[in-house]
Amino acid sequence: MTDNERLAQLLFGDGGLTPEDCEQRYPERGLPEGARVTRFSPSPTGYLHIGGLFGALTDVLTARASGGITYLRIEDTDKKREVEDGVSAIINGFKNFGMTFDEGVTGFGTESGAYGPYTQSQRVEIYHAVAKRLVEEGKAYPCFCTAGELSEIRSEQENGGADITGYFGKWARCRDLSFEEQKRRIEAGEPYVLRFRSDGDENRRIFFDDIIRGKIEMPENVIDEVILKSDGIPTYHFAHVCDDHYMRTTHVIRGEEWISSVPKHIALFKACGFRVPKYAHTPQVMKTDEETGAKRKLSKRKDPEAAVSYFVEQGYPKESVIEYIMTLLNSNFEDWRRANPDASCWDFPFNLKKMSVSGCLFDMAKLNDVSKNIISRMSAGEIYGNILNWAKEYDGELYSLLSRDEDYAVGIFSIDRDCPKPRKDIASWQQVRNFVEYFYDEIYTPDFTLPENISPADAAAILKKYLEVFDIEDDKDTWFAKIKEICEPLGYTPNVKEYKKNPDAFKGHVGDVSTVIRLAITSRRNTPDLHSIIQLLGRQRVLERIENAVKEYES
């Protein structure tokens, strides 16, 4: 038995799981050639970030496009940063947007799939099996350096102007300890971590092909990275290498902030005898800073929209958020959407190679436009159901009003909907209260403010004249014809073109007359079809509102 084998036995004991056992437990997946296996692997350290939804969508689309699979893995090795219900927050965040995975964690303590456990803290036996093999082969060793000693090394490097800082070369004090020294210190109970023994050379370069960014050249890794912490829990760098191998990940898709870690990850894959996966490093999700006008990364602290829960609370349909993210993922999505207006966004032929290299800009105005288009294609019944579900949790008063009379509420959302160009007033369900308030007396507050070109006296005259001809039974054409008829006696022309030719000859035109009537009934200058609104409100409420407006203008 070699010293390395004796060291491995001292560190991990006899027997136990071996890498060969893991190979049998987690065989190749047997998917069709070219099928991609991707994973989304968040840490339960807080809410699901919009960048997380962006990344997960990239993983899912990549796998689906190739006939592969995507799994959800929870990377919970950093217990200090883990928050209570962090896993549930991630799972619920995905559920709110209809995001599903083929395998992996499905809830707190639940999962599905043959390559689990899908939570890293439950896979320690696997990491120890691989770490033990690395020790046996002389590729890993125990390091007894204290925090103070490591700080001393870093200070020495920084003061000496070293190009690279870290535990390597002459600063790797425990790298070449004799087995006898290692054994003595372990048996004495000295705490230690396990480090990877790098064979990198700072003068050599590595090259790898990033699917999004093309060929990337970087210095080799020379750092003897920690792979097991003093409590035996693996570091992120080591755990994900083992997991991606035994879960048979073919494509590692992650944020561009991980590019600098690729050399150490490739070194670990090769040292373990694992096949190196394909890499794709996605751009960060950015926004324009309101104060400086410069682009910056979305901030959990500054930007409420950084959390996907924000879009749920605001009432954005899940389809709207997913579709908007699609526009960020591939620049040709919008062209595809115009050519396929009725297709599901999941039918889009997503391509990693068409992702932007620079940061993609999250634009709330653009999201609102996308969402208005999505909602405009919904039926009145679909809109009603969606709003009711949202309002039940976030606006109890609105929920009570809408659920009181379903037919009436659906009638509201039917106005200007079944037509070639449906209105696009609503971007999120939170906006519905403002949209429907004049249909419900309980939340309606009259506003009698007139346009500058119409005096209160003229407004009162228009409304009194309208009351003379008003008939709730009139169809739309008859109703509007009557509005035109009352124009001339009041000094207004029923012909807008005539007014534009000779504005001094009239007080205004039929549009001004209609505006006064619209304001009296809804307190809005812009609404869906006014005739339809009148039919829904009914004769009594229309008369009451007009009469109240007349009193206001004559007072």
Locations of regions flagged by a protein language model:
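Glycine- and acidic
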Residues: 38-45, 71-76, 246-252, 305-308, ...
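Catalytic adenosine-cofactor/nucleotide-binding cores of aminoacyl-tRNA synthetases and other
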Residues: 272-453, 522-555
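Short amphipathic alpha-helical segments and their helix-coil junctions
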Residues: 35-39, 71, 303-306, 344-352, ...
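Active-site cores that bind ATP or allylic diphosphates and position pyrophosphate for catalysis
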Residues: 133, 141-281, 286-298, 307, ...
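Helix-rich, typically C-terminal accessory recognition domains appended to large enzymatic cores
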Residues: 482-537, 541
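Residue-level signal for inorganic ion chemistry
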Residues: 59, 90, 134, 138, ...
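A generic secondary-structure signal for well-formed alpha-helical elements
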Residues: 19, 94-101, 135-142, 154-157, ...
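N-terminal Rossmann-like or analogous alpha/beta NTP/dinucleotide-binding catalytic cores
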Residues: 2-162, 260-274, 320
